Regions:
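Primarily the internal scaffold of c-type cytochrome electron-transfer domains
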Residues: 33-36, 45, 52, 60-129, ...
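Propeptide (latency) domains of metzincin metalloproteases
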Residues: 138, 144-146, 150-177, 183, ...
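Bacterial Sec-dependent N-terminal signal peptides
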Residues: 1-39
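Secretory-pathway extracellular proteins and peptide precursors enriched for disulfide-bonded cysteines
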Residues: 18-24, 45-46, 173, 206, ...
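Short non-domain terminal segments
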Residues: 5, 13, 19-21, 63, ...
Length: 414
């Protein structure tokens, strides 16, 4: 009996020692992982070369890409980049007779200045322009290391200053900008105080790469540039990502990062890089119904509900979009890509073409991806002139009878 008790005690002791050993190993590994993650985060900015570094080997692509809306979706605010007018008579937004904001140019920069009951009461410098200007722009201001959205934006469709979307009929200079906002308008922004701290996120002003550059799709390129510069005769690239070789899912995940609607972070912004699985970084709503999806920012979810997409094994965003070129508004070009699948050989050619006009074959888009009013980009006009919603093309490819009817009426003699 004594031997049995001693054996049990020895077994228990061995078990406890073994468990403690594995626990300590796990703690050490976790500590190493956390330290490695911290080091990677601290070194992240150094891993980027900037898009200009790509030009020496890829000049034609670079020269084309810098004209795209992606590349110009954020810029340091200056006279060239701010789309709105600072001319007297064109630089004021009136909320009501007693309250307005004027856009002012001074020797120290550009400012939005609140005037209440005849006195300037608040001002903030315009530091960053968000948006290429094709649809419009909104503006950010630094306050220390914090970023805030300014109350007045610019809307290209009305060629005028407007109240920033979602703002009330009063001036607001205190809407904070977090890293997730910047993740879809910059290539990289270094966070120096995370939202996880319970305080507003802060950023390093000197470690922001403006615009969606080459490295958003091809991954951080500093190591690639260093290697290629030292090995100029090598034709097989190293240390760079080629999205053209991605699986369908990885290709879609890359675009979905910013065109996939609202997602919840489970890892810090900017840790997702090209080639990663989106589900490892975000909580994704896979059940969103198309009736609830806005045309702005939900391109993936709308496309995913389209018959074209659901019946294709290969269709991705790049089936229709060439990210290197500024193709926006080129209806004929996009229609040609539609007809790569929808043609007489496949028996899927548009029946309207055969019965009406030949010119419709150059425009599939207006009937099957019509412009619709955004519920998110709704802006208040100055002087109480009401509100305007921006028109954007839906990515839910379908048959829209009303849009088709309007198109046929408009083009009946063509």
């Amino acid at each position: 009996m004594t031997r049995i008790l001693k054996f049990k005690r020895s077994s228990l002791l061995i078990f406890l020692i073994t468990s403690l050993f594995f626990f300590l190993i796990q703690c050490i590994n976790n500590g190493a992982d956390k330290k490695e993650a911290l080091n990677n985060e601290n070194d992240a900015f150094q891993q980027y070369a900037g898009s200009k570094a790509c030009a020496s080997c890829h000049k034609n692509i670079y020269d084309s890409f810098i004209k795209t809306n992606h590349f110009t979706t954020s810029q340091i605010a200056d006279a060239e980049n701010i789309k709105g007018s600072f001319e007297k008579g064109k630089n004021v937004f009136h909320y009501n007779p007693a309250l307005f904001v004027s856009m002012q140019k001074t020797d120290s920069g550009f400012y939005e200045v609140e005037n209440s009951h005849g006195s300037d009461t608040l001002s903030a410098r315009t530091d960053i322009a968000i948006g290429s200007g094709t649809i419009g722009q909104t503006y950010l201001s630094w306050k220390g290391n914090n970023l805030f959205q300014l109350p007045i934006s610019y809307l290209s469709s009305v060629h005028d200053w407007v109240n920033s979307p979602g703002y009330s009929d009063q001036t607001i200079f205190s809407r904070p900008i977090n890293a997730r906002c910047l993740e879809c308008h910059t290539t990289y922004a270094k966070s120096i105080q995370s939202e996880l701290s319970g305080q507003q996120e802060q950023f390093d002003k000197q470690k922001i790469i403006y615009g969606i550059g080459c490295e958003r799709c091809h991954g951080p390129g500093a190591k690639h540039v260093e290697w290629q510069t030292g090995n100029p005769k090598e034709t097989i690239p190293k240390y760079i990502v080629n999205p053209g070789k991605f699986s369908k899912k990885l290709s879609l995940d890359l675009c979905r990062l910013c065109h996939g609607g609202k997602m919840g972070n489970i890892k810090p912004a900017f840790t997702f890089t090209s080639g990663d699985k989106l589900q490892d970084y975000f909580i994704i709503d896979e059940l969103a119904h198309t009736s609830n999806l806005d045309v702005h920012g939900n391109q993936f979810s709308l496309l995913a509900n389209s018959k074209c997409f659901r019946t294709s094994k290969t269709m991705t965003c790049v089936t229709c979009h060439n990210a290197h070129d500024n193709e926006r508004g080129d209806v004929a070009l996009f229609s040609q890509r539609c007809m790569a699948c929808h043609n007489k050989e496949h028996g899927t050619f548009c029946t309207t073409v055969a019965t009406t006009m030949s010119s419709i074959s150059a425009n599939c888009i207006d009937c099957h991806m019509p412009q619709m009013a955004s519920k998110k980009i709704v802006s208040q006009l100055s002087d109480g002139r009401g509100f305007t919603a921006e028109l954007l093309r839906t990515h839910l490819i379908a048959v829209y009878p009303e849009a088709t009817k309007n198109f046929l009426l408009k083009n009946k003699n063509k």
